[in-house]
């Protein structure tokens, strides 16, 4: 997504990617590292959330991942898997605020956890499908 945003949205064609230990103008931080430094780094104080940048640009949510099943899965088994996913999602959200402490220590306030998790969507609707199609079209332009 970073390449799409840089090259297509911002017309930055000469971006080069270097190791984090090399001199750089910016860093891409993901996962726990991204959450840990969500307010920026001393040497890089400006923060851009890629999902937020995509949404501002396209007015669509970005689909970072999705669950898919093979076509040859029997319908009954597919329903069991779907039900398991929904149950796990409910258990996760129910237990989110009952945890005695984070599994991975991150300096993050419960209100920030709430705001972060409220932005997550676990269902594919029309906007999400449109977003996947739009992203694929942009990827095709980069080839």
What is each PLM-predicted segment?
Residues 15-99:
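Pocket-lining segment of extracytoplasmic ligand-binding domains
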Residues 1-2, 29-31, 63-67, 120, ...:
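Long, contiguous hydrophobic alpha-helical segments, chiefly transmembrane helices and signal peptides
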Residues 98-143:
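An extracytoplasmic/periplasmic, membrane-proximal ligand-sensing/linker region
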Residues 9, 85-88, 120:
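Alpha-helix boundary/capping residues
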Residues 3-7, 86, 136:
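Generic solvent-exposed, charged/amphipathic alpha-helical segments
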Residues 1-16, 97:
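Ligand-binding cleft/hinge of the Venus flytrap
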């Amino acid at each position: 997504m970073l390449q799409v945003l840089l090259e297509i949205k911002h017309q930055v064609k000469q971006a080069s990617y270097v190791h984090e230990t090399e001199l750089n103008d910016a860093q891409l931080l993901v996962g726990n590292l991204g959450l840990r430094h969500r307010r920026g780094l001393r040497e890089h104080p400006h923060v851009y959330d890629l999902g937020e940048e995509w949404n501002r640009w396209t007015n669509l949510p970005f689909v970072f991942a999705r669950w898919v099943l093979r076509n040859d899965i029997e319908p009954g088994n597919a329903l069991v898997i779907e039900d398991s996913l929904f149950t796990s999602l409910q258990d996760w959200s129910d237990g989110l605020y009952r945890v005695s402490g984070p599994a991975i220590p991150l300096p993050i306030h419960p209100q920030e956890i709430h705001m972060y998790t409220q932005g997550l969507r676990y269902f594919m609707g029309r906007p999400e499908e449109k977003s996947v199609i739009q992203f694929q079209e942009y990827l095709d332009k980069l080839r």
